[in-house]
């Protein structure tokens, strides 16, 4: 750089530099302790859920009359990606998914549009439809969950204590929302004997009317006086069971109380709904979500204090136990990564001391905390929390941030060895290194551009990677210009009179010979390198594919599905049997069970499933990750042996966006029947793949149904109709809700049913008396033909088409992503080609998300390439030099792919990011070498000598910085998330650096026709 020499300025104004060093370290430490803490970075879940219920309707009916019109209306949503729906008897759940390109700032606007679209369609839905309801807070995370348990305490008693605790926790700092789980709703049942009802000359509808009138909340008006308004309140609402029993009933001239002719009881709703257990004990859960921008560790401490207060006030025998403790998990995660960061700092410092010597090592050791603290200040300013991505990125950048400092320090050391004084050495280092270092830093940062500017959920998840590493690299360049010269001026020592050539030792002589050989046989070197590169690229199909690996968290998510139509009672019994098997297993730390429902989203990387009576879920927490896999396998084996009709699936928490199964393929078609037929054929082919396990479809078998064909003429003659018959059957078989009882903050339904009717058997259905009007009862078999059939009880759709997902798990050494690709491209290729028009088989789940993410990641690559070439052009000023430096970029792939292949590590998102970044780092080294050649030519050296001496002069700093970078990645190897990146970086950078130092001189000499001496 011409003009002002910033290194000289910094040395002449040392006090200013020292002031900023102290200020940055102080500000960095303050920022570190005030940064937000989380296990994973936040990302936007672009999904809203629309639900509706239509009691009594079949899955086919509700699909045609409710799901289909709602889906068609929702197709008008701006930025819509796809719509997926789950329709079951009497209810539908519609998932509206927006494109990843929709900015998160516009998400709430889209949800408002969805509300308007649904409201527009509401009036067109059949009468009796409840809803639609919209949940646009599907991404709320309940990281702290507590269970209230206690033998001898009823659900209602536990609910009341939980409700009190909920109110108090709502006021705790950083708490956004508190929800109760596993609450069993109460219901008041008014049961009458059918014969007694008939003896009074009463019909069920008479009782309905009386209960509805007495239970209705109606305003009684307001009295307006000159001074005030006085409201009139009418007492006598049905707020207790006793008030119901005392309800007067008049039949003709007779008068009596409801309790005289009916049994009135308040009990838990039958059947039960959404049960929760903790360690096998019935529980009421308290789920707490953190406010946006909150600190998990602060929240954890605040909750711990409040819960301790609550425990002291609970009666003996009632306990509060922690089910999920995200603050503790975050604390452990931050501790582990902070430990890895410190290990990386120690490793890099040790390498610096060994390679540069004690005093030069001191300079580098002092530069590291300055840059790290400056990075913490930047993170605090930008609102980037400490989590797996940001801390991992700091470790990644640690090796890179010392590169510029190493180059400056090494150059100062060389100049001092050549006899310059300290100020002149600093000036020379700045003059020779500042501009190429800046270009190299910008190019290295540009290599990470695809991560920072890609669209999509995955890119959002790791988006902090680019911003942290780019800022750290730029800050490291600033430090190398201002801090390194000042500290080098102060600390670097060379013995008096000591002058030694940079090429004195044996390593340099060997390297000198290698360079000379490469220049002599430059065409062979170039062709050989190209062949090695091509051969390595050909290895890619043989490298395992896995976009995001499983985490090391100890949780096992166990989903158990019984045959469609199974009652919640049966599901409860199965889940209780599984819990019994876990008692006494020392591999189990704790387990929570959810019957008829799913666990709440206790971490962002967990997707709750839709409620279903035949579904149970257990969150098993293993003692540690070492016993996790054996616990999972043994539990699945127990279920398969003891409950052969149940379909169990265990999954682990991933380190990226989640999927229900590791292997998923979806088949969509025109109609339900053919779609199901083709899906069964595809599932059979998938099952034949070697090592496939647990192959299933999300489309259950048909369930039994009783179909009544009413004789309309006969019923009308008897004074009845379809509605009255359906209602009478509902009263007898299930109980009919007729009113509500207002009890504090609880709204308790009042249902009427006939005594003993809930025990009706299928065999007795034809003789069941039904009311047909005028007080007459006739056997059901006299007015209806009764048939027993099977029908589809569940229909999945995607973008208006019936869709069946084929799921499974991979066995053996291959990753799930690799298996899906082989299934799709080979096993199912012929099947796909022969599908009729309108039927498609596509990848689903994690592999589909990964392919989308790769596309998003590839989109900014042209911009990255352009920026790198532009920086090269400005720095090297010649197109041939730009091309030479540019084509060395892909050399990093050689070592990266070989490393992944040899270590059996998967190629996934982070390893792809690593390969993109490697290109920038390799080009950076080429710039430094080519710039040195240009300087030597400007000093009057012959072309051959300029190339040889430049390569030898830059050999030490380039290799030293590369080795330091590699050592900085070592602490990342234990992390499943970062391991593929670390492996690809270590292998790629080492090999690319070695090859680059030999190939760049060969390319330069080949293009510029530089020849060496005839005899070497």
Where are the regions that the model predicts?
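Transmembrane helices with small-residue packing motifs
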Residues: 15-16, 23-57, 119-128, 380, ...
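Hydrophobic transmembrane alpha-helices and their membrane-interface caps
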Residues: 30-34, 346-413, 471, 867-954, ...
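Transmembrane alpha-helices and their membrane-interface boundaries in multi-pass membrane transporters
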Residues: 398-412, 434-453, 460-499, 618, ...
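Solvent-exposed, membrane-proximal periplasmic/extracellular interface segments of envelope transport
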Residues: 4-6, 61-137, 195-216, 237, ...
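Signature of alpha-helical transmembrane segments and their immediate interfacial
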Residues: 1-37, 433, 499-548, 665
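Solvent-exposed, non-transmembrane alpha-helical starts
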Residues: 19, 58-65, 102-112, 142-146, ...
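Extracytoplasmic/periplasmic membrane-proximal domains and adjacent transmembrane bundles
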Residues: 9, 51, 122, 168-346, ...
């Amino acid at each position: 750089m011409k003009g002002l020499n910033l290194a000289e300025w910094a040395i002449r104004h040392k006090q200013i530099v020292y002031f900023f060093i102290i200020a940055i370290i102080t500000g960095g430490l303050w920022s570190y302790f005030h940064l937000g803490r989380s296990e994973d970075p936040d990302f936007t879940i672009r999904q809203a859920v629309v639900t509706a219920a239509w009691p009594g309707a079949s899955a086919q009916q509700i699909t045609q009359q409710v799901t289909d019109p709602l889906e068609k209306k929702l197709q008008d949503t701006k930025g819509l990606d796809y719509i997926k729906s789950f329709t079951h008897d009497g209810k539908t759940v519609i998932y509206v998914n927006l494109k990843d390109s929709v900015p998160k700032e516009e998400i709430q606007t889209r949800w408002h549009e969805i509300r308007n679209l649904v409201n527009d369609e509401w009036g067109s839905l059949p009468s009796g439809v409840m809803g639609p309801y919209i949940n646009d807070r599907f991404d709320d995370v309940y990281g702290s969950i507590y269970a209230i348990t206690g033998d001898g305490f009823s659900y209602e008693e536990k609910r009341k204590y939980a409700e009190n605790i909920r109110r108090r926790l709502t006021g705790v700092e950083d708490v956004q929302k508190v929800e109760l789980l596993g609450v069993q709703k109460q219901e008041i049942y008014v049961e009458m004997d059918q014969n007694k009802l008939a003896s009074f000359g009463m019909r069920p509808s008479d009782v309905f009317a009386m209960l509805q009138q007495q239970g209705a909340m109606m305003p009684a008006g307001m009295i307006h006086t000159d001074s005030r308004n006085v409201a009139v309140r009418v007492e006598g609402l049905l707020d207790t069971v006793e008030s119901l029993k005392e309800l007067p009933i008049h039949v003709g001239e007779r008068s009596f109380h409801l309790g005289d002719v009916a049994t009135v009881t308040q009990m838990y709703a039958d059947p039960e709904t959404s049960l929760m257990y903790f360690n096998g004990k019935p529980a009421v859960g308290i789920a707490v979500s953190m406010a946006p921008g909150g600190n998990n560790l602060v929240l954890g401490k605040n909750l711990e204090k409040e819960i301790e207060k609550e425990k002291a006030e609970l009666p003996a025998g009632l306990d509060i136990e922690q089910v999920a403790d995200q603050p503790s998990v975050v604390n452990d995660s931050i501790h582990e990564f902070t430990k890895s960061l410190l290990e990386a700092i120690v490793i890099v410092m040790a390498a610096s001391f060994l390679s540069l010597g004690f005093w030069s090592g001191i300079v580098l050791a002092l530069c590291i905390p300055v840059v790290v603290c400056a990075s913490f200040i930047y993170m605090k300013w930008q609102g980037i929390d400490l989590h797996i991505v940001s801390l991992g990125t700091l470790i990644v950048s640690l090796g890179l941030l010392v590169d510029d400092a190493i180059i400056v320090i090494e150059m100062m050391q060389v100049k001092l060895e050549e006899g310059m004084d300290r100020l002149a050495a600093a000036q020379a280092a700045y003059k020779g290194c500042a501009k190429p270092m800046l270009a190299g830093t910008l190019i290295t940062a540009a290599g990470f551009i695809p991560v920072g500017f890609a669209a999509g959920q995955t890119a959002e998840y790791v988006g902090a990677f680019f911003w942290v590493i780019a800022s750290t690299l730029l800050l490291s360049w600033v430090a190398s210009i201002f801090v390194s010269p000042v500290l080098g001026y102060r600390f670097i020592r060379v013995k008096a009179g000591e002058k030694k050539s940079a090429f004195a030792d044996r390593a340099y002589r060997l390297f000198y010979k290698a360079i000379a050989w490469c220049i002599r046989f430059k065409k062979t070197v170039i062709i050989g390198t190209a062949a090695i590169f091509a051969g390595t690229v050909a290895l890619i199909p043989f490298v395992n594919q896995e976009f995001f690996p499983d985490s090391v968290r100890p949780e096992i998510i166990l989903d158990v599905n019984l045959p469609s139509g199974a009652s919640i009672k049966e599901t409860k019994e199965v889940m209780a049997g599984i819990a019994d098997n876990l008692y006494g297993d020392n591999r189990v730390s704790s387990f929570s069970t959810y019957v008829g429902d799913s666990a709440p989203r206790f971490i962002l990387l967990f997707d709750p499933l839709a409620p279903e009576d035949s579904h149970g879920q257990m969150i098993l927490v293993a003692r540690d990750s070492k016993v996790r896999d054996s616990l999972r396998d043994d539990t699945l084996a127990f279920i398969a042996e003891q409950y052969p009709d149940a379909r169990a699936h265990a999954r682990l928490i991933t380190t990226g966006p989640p999927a229900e199964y590791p292997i998923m393929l979806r088949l969509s078609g025109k109609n339900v029947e053919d779609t199901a037929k083709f899906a069964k054929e595809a599932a059979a082919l998938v099952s034949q793949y070697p090592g496939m396990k647990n192959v299933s479809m999300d489309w259950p078998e048909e369930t039994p149904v009783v179909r009544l064909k009413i004789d309309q003429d006969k019923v009308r003659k008897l004074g009845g109709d379809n509605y009255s018959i359906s209602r009478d059957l509902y009263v007898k078989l299930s109980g009919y809700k007729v009113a509500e009882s207002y009890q504090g903050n609880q709204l308790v339904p009042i249902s009427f049913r006939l005594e003993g009717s809930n025990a009706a058997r299928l065999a007795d259905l034809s003789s069941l008396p039904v009311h047909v009007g005028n007080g007459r009862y006739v056997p059901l078999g006299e007015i209806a033909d009764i048939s027993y059939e099977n029908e589809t009880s569940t229909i999945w759709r995607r973008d208006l088409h019936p869709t069946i997902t084929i799921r499974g798990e991979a066995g053996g050494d291959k990753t799930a992503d690799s298996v899906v690709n082989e299934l799709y491209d080979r096993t199912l290729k012929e099947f796909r080609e022969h599908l009729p028009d309108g039927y498609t088989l596509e990848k689903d789940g994690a592999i589909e998300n990964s392919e989308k993410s790769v596309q998003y990641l590839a989109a900014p690559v042209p911009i990255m390439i352009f920026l790198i070439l532009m920086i090269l052009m400005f720095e090297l000023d010649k197109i041939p030099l730009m091309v030479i430096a540019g084509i060395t970029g892909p050399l990093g792939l050689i070592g990266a792919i070989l490393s992944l292949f040899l270590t059996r590590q998967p190629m996934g998102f982070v390893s792809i990011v690593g390969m993109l970044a490697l290109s920038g780092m390799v080009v950076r080294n080429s710039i430094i070498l080519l710039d040195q050649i240009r300087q030597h030519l400007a000093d009057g050296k012959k072309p051959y000598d300029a190339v040889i001496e430049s390569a030898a002069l830059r050999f030490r700093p380039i290799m030293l910085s590369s080795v330091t970078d590699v050592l900085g990645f070592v602490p990342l190897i234990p992390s499943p998330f970062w391991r593929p990146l670390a492996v690809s970086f270590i292998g790629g950078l080492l090999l690319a650096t070695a090859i680059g130092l030999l190939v760049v001189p060969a390319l330069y000499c080949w293009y510029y026709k530089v020849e060496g001496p005839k005899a070497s």
